């Protein structure tokens, strides 16, 4: 059975509010601001092509990177180094969180616990992947995602962050068998 969580219009404005700390500025300013803070973060998770590319440009290597070769719904070819570790490809349509994406993120954290680095390449869209990336993350994980036209958001995963993401997931529309 095909199951996915679909973003209802009523949640769109809520998702525009940063879940963590907003680091404002044009590229590369936000990345340079957080570089020293993130140098010893483990695990470090990036969501988005521009975020992953720029974190790598400042010399950091995320343990888990989730991206879709798009930015703001336009094709984008990020300059992302190949990963020494595991590459997972998963389908996830825009505005959704699919069961395969959830499973891929859960598997990625399991692989991270065994010292592997993981890149998840999404065929479709990864914009909502921050939600399950926080839900499945161990407490203390650092998750970074982009805030369009503003900068980047830095999340230090806590139980409170997990509760907020779980609340958002519960408010999403559950679709079975594509109906």
Curated annotation (Swiss-Prot):
It catalyses: 3'-dephospho-CoA + GTP = GDP + CoA + H(+). Keywords: Coenzyme A biosynthesis, GTP-binding, Kinase, Nucleotide-binding, Transferase. GO terms for molecular function: GTP binding; kinase activity. One of its GO terms (biological process) is coenzyme A biosynthetic process. It is an enzyme of class 2 (transferase). It comes from the Archaea. The keyword Transferase applies. Its EC number is 2.7.1.237. GTP binds at residues 49-51, 68, 70, 126. Pathway: Cofactor biosynthesis; coenzyme A biosynthesis. InterPro entries: deph_CoA_kin_Thcocales (IPR054930), GTP-dep_dephospho-CoA_kin (IPR007164). The keyword GTP-binding applies. Belongs to the GTP-dependent DPCK family. HAMAP family: Dephospho_CoA_kinase_GTP_dep. Catalyzes the GTP-dependent phosphorylation of the 3'-hydroxyl group of dephosphocoenzyme A to form coenzyme A (CoA). This is GTP-dependent dephospho-CoA kinase.
């Amino acid at each position: 059975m095909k199951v996915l969580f679909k973003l209802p219009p009523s949640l769109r404005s809520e998702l525009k509010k940063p879940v963590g700390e907003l680091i404002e500025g044009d590229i590369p300013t936000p990345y340079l601001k957080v570089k020293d803070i993130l140098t010893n973060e483990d695990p470090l998770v990036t969501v988005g092509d521009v975020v992953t590319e720029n974190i790598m440009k400042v010399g950091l290597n995320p343990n888990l990177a989730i991206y879709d070769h798009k930015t703001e719904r336009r094709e984008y070819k990020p300059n992302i180094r190949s990963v020494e570790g595991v590459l997972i490809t998963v389908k996830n349509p825009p505005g959704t969180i699919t069961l395969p994406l959830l499973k891929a993120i859960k598997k990625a954290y399991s692989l991270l616990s065994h010292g592997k680095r993981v890149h998840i390449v999404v065929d479709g869209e990864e914009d909502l992947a921050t939600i399950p990336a926080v839900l499945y993350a161990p407490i203390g994980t650092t998750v970074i995602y982009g805030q369009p036209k503003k900068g980047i958001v830095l999340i230090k995963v806590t139980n409170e962050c997990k509760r907020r993401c779980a609340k958002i997931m519960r408010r999403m529309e559950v679709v079975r068998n594509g109906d």
